[in-house]
Amino acid sequence: MKPSIVAKLEALQERHEEVQALLGDAGVIADQDRFRALSREYAQLTDVSHCFLAWRQVQDDLTTAEMLLDDPEMRDMAQEELKEARGRLAELEQQLQILLLPKDPDDERDCFLEVRAGTGGDEAALFAGDLFRMYSRYAEARRWRIEIMSASEGEHGGYKEVIARVSGDGAYGRLKFESGGHRVQRVPATESQGRIHTSACTVAVMPAVPEAELPQINPADLRIDTYRSSGAGGQHVNTTDSAIRITHLPTGIVVECQDERSQHKNKAKAMSVLGARIRAAEIAKRQQEEASTRRNLLGSGDRSDRVRTYNFPQGRVTDHRINLTLYRLDEVMEGKLDNLIEPIVQEHQADQLSALAEQE
């Protein structure tokens, strides 16, 4: 490994020990904000620290084995140990390179998940419902909380559009590669001839950012409409104009929220989603202007970004970005997504590593 990388790892190791000591300090424990910030930093440094300590240990083992090569009685054993240590060293160096990759500061945040029915009418709305259920199951398995912010139900079930907040450690970092077009091929329940129909949905995932970090929105740029909510809610539905529709005039972004009975709460929820959408649009524009020729595995949430095809007759799901096909569609629809998410995360890391190599 390059001396500059080793020096960086030594500095991180020292900081890990320093933070560990600070977390035991009474003054730090009394300051809850600082304690929380240091706890997060400690958690982020722990993996790289442990990996670097393991790398150092293997380096020591390697040196010991090389010294034993001069001893005729120990040579065979030393050669075996050398082979094993070199293999382990290569593995640890690869892990350390990945751990040192620049982190997306949004990765640890909660996120907003939007699923919208596209082409395909009722069948697209039903599939949007299936996708939302799939993500909900995945969130439950990871002990994340999922809260519907706004939903427009399809006439025959499912959703025309559903927006939810997913709260939990690393929710955005795990789900961010889901943005884009999701296509389904299956025989609809209403199809009497048994013909396979193709319909589509779009998914958009945006980090939920604290209000202080959101773009400043000029109230004069907003048009706010109120209307009577529809859908579930019993006697309280359609009795007051509690539903809110906010239009951001400069961008044309529209957010609706009718989940709460209180107009004030619906407005607060809609504003948080609007801020996240405006921020996401600004970041996407900036990335486009930087116009990297390198492929971007992070979809824009546009249907033109083909993410996956879910083929029910064949029981397969295909990720078009990395040409990955799995014949485990039933498991995937039940929320077992790690076999799809992990390869795309690894591919993204490989792209980052090759970008760093080109810069050196």
Swiss-Prot record:
It comes from Edwardsiella ictaluri (strain 93-146). PROSITE patterns: RF_PROK_I. InterPro entries: PCRF, Pep_chain_release_fac_I, Pep_chain_release_fac_I_sf, Prokaryotic/Mito_RF, RF-1. This is Peptide chain release factor 1. GO terms for cellular component: cytoplasm. The modification N5-methylglutamine is found at Q235. The keyword Secreted does not apply. It is found in: Cytoplasm. GO terms for molecular function: translation release factor activity, codon specific. Methylated by PrmC. Methylation increases the termination efficiency of RF1. Its main location: cytoplasm. Keywords: Cytoplasm, Methylation, Protein biosynthesis. Peptide chain release factor 1 directs the termination of translation in response to the peptide chain termination codons UAG and UAA. Belongs to the prokaryotic/mitochondrial release factor family. Gene3D superfamilies: 3.30.160.20, 3.30.70.1660, 6.10.140.1950. Residues 285-304 are annotated as: Disordered.
